[in-house]
Amino acid sequence: MSLPPSDSPQSRRPEASDPAALLRAFARLSEGTRAGSEHPLDAPDPGASTDLMDALRDRTARVAVLGQGYVGLPLAARLAGAGFEVTGLDGDPERCRRVAAGEPVLGEGSTELAAELAGHQAEGRYSIRATPARDQPPADHPLAACDVAIVCVPTPLAPDRTPDLSHVRAAGLELGAHLADDTLVVLESTTYPGTTRGAFRDAIDDGRRAAGRSPARLFLAYSPEREDPGRDPSEQRRVPKLVGGTTEASEAVTVALYESAYPDVVPTGSAEVAEAAKLFENVFRAVNIALVNEAKTVLDAMGIDVWRVLDAAATKPFGFMPFQPGPGMGGHCIPIDPFYFAWAGEQHGVRARFVELAGEVNRAMPSWVTQRLEAALEERGRALRGAHVLVLGLAYKRDVADLRESPALDLVDRLLFAGAQVITVDPHVERATTPGGAELEPVPLDAARLEAADAVLVVTDHTAFDDPLIAERARLAVDTRGILRAFAHQMGERLVLA
């Protein structure tokens, strides 16, 4: 895991590395923060809680959702379906136009969501508009009339791999400039513990001051998104919803909001616990993926099939949880959240060395796969430079169009840098740009392309791929997902598991 520049305060690493100390440090964030808080955001007017509760229970509360992407759009649809009047705000006017026109904007798997939103629009329960300029008169701004504002904006990494809260801060400034008192504000973006009560609340304050307004009195809470692109919507709806408030009243009204749309709402007792829980969920997954990825490299050196090892180990009914290896990690959370977790630990004097190591292992996988492909070609008398490589899959996971942090894009850059001639195939992706600036336009998979390639590199295990055709026609298949294992006897030395 890369670190901040050596001359930055964050680069001064503490020596402590006790995981229990790290969790205790996070716990201290929420100790004593409930009772007696005098911050204006924590002190709505007496009776405001009852009024908001009533509006939430009878569905008359007006809801604004800032950010209409993979998190905000499904959330807006769910709340509109529960009976609320929902306004979606997004900084991309073209996205707003397409959503308003009933078009799917989250890939081909989002047609059902697009139809649902179109129905809510027709019934007057959902509308979407581009985020207005901050200097728009308060009375005309859509946030001025809302009772609930939910923030679902990206929380990426800065170039030095530290948390980038610029989108969260921009949302806070917008809210501060326009929200009325006694509004419920919920942050859903994944972030480190203390953000809601700290950086986010500070941004709201700054927005108030910049607009010449007195300090706001708001309900403030955190409820982490748990969206899983590609998951069946009926399964996604059953995922429990965590809620943590900055005060007991804030948590209570937030629970009431989400209970209207989620079958299982879990209060955590504080915003910090909810923030840390979301991070830890993804750190847990990242660490276990790193473990099986490292096991793959070790077992490969021994000539042992890691997938057969995992299948055998998974027969134990206790004490083992199978994770699958791959070409690296992708998506909007898993590759990023460990860095947020480790950075937050450093701010409290604790170094999360195990988490850092997991990040290093996962980020190294595209390099290892490239080396494995190069070695497989050389064993057959072919150099990687000048070789025709057919890359199957650009999305970061099966059966989605999501390219965020996809290891496939890193792999393509490495292959191009090595001098390979690369053709890509992905039935869910129309075009893509690699981190190195290469413009990709995937083509359909057919027998001729398989036969013409010096090597076929399986990166994403899309169900649309014709596995028997690949097994029959590929001269060399380097499989990072294990989808061709069933054809190992047929393929013989033409199959390399990586």
Predicted features by range, described:
Residues 2-498:
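Structural/interface elements that position substrates and couple domains in central-metabolism enzymes
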